[in-house]
């Protein structure tokens, strides 16, 4: 029995999220996309021979921080300092996440002053997340978790026995 990505993604939850019209969910979806964009394009921009390398490193760090913000389950399973966990827990509301993503986007927009690179895509992605959280905040929508990634406590989540069988 092999594990597949489909076992970890909840398609029914995605449809439910789309119908909810809760912009905090959309912000979280773009947050997942931003994790991939920040890390991938950050690595890609390490090969420039200019000051863009610094912004590439910042982008990689941003991707890792967003990973812990958008997937809070990782805070419980990864050995992290208490200061870092407290820092991440500050961003549990729409308003704070809006400001966080806006600050991150501004940092990446500054990279354009050095050289126009693919980090513009990172900046735009972070801006979209910021706008989504801002709309949720102004509409007084409750911060809501998405149903895309299955919760490890769900009955149909692949457990240790499945992993042991695979090995």
UniProtKB/Swiss-Prot annotation:
The chain crosses the membrane at residues 23-43, 49-69, 98-114, 121-137. Glycans are attached at residue 22. The modification Phosphothreonine is found at residues 146, 153. Pfam families: Cg6151-P. GO terms for cellular component: Golgi membrane. It is a multi-pass membrane protein. InterPro entries: TVP18/Ca-channel_flower. It is found in: Golgi apparatus membrane. GO terms for biological process: vesicle-mediated transport. Keywords: Glycoprotein, Golgi apparatus, Membrane, Phosphoprotein, Transmembrane, Transmembrane helix. Its main location: Golgi. Belongs to the TVP18 family. Interacts with TVP15 and YIP4. Golgi membrane protein involved in vesicular trafficking. This is Golgi apparatus membrane protein TVP18.
């Amino acid at each position: 029995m092999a594990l597949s990505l489909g076992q970890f993604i909840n398609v029914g939850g995605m449809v439910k999220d789309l119908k909810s019209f809760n912009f905090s969910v959309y912000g979280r979806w773009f947050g997942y996309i931003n994790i991939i964009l920040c890390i991938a394009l950050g690595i890609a921009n390490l090969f420039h021979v200019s000051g863009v390398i610094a912004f590439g490193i910042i982008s990689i760090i941003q991707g890792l921080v967003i990973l812990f913000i958008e997937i809070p389950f990782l805070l419980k399973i990864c050995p992290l300092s208490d200061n870092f966990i407290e820092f991440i827990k500050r961003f549990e509301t729409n308003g704070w996440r809006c400001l966080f993503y806006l600050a991150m986007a501004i940092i990446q927009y500054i990279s354009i002053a050095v050289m126009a690179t693919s980090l513009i895509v990172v900046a735009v992605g972070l801006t979209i997340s910021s706008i989504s959280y801002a709309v949720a905040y102004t509409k007084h929508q409750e911060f809501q978790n998405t149903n895309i990634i299955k919760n490890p406590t769900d009955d149909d989540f692949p457990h240790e026995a499945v992993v042991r069988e695979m090995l």
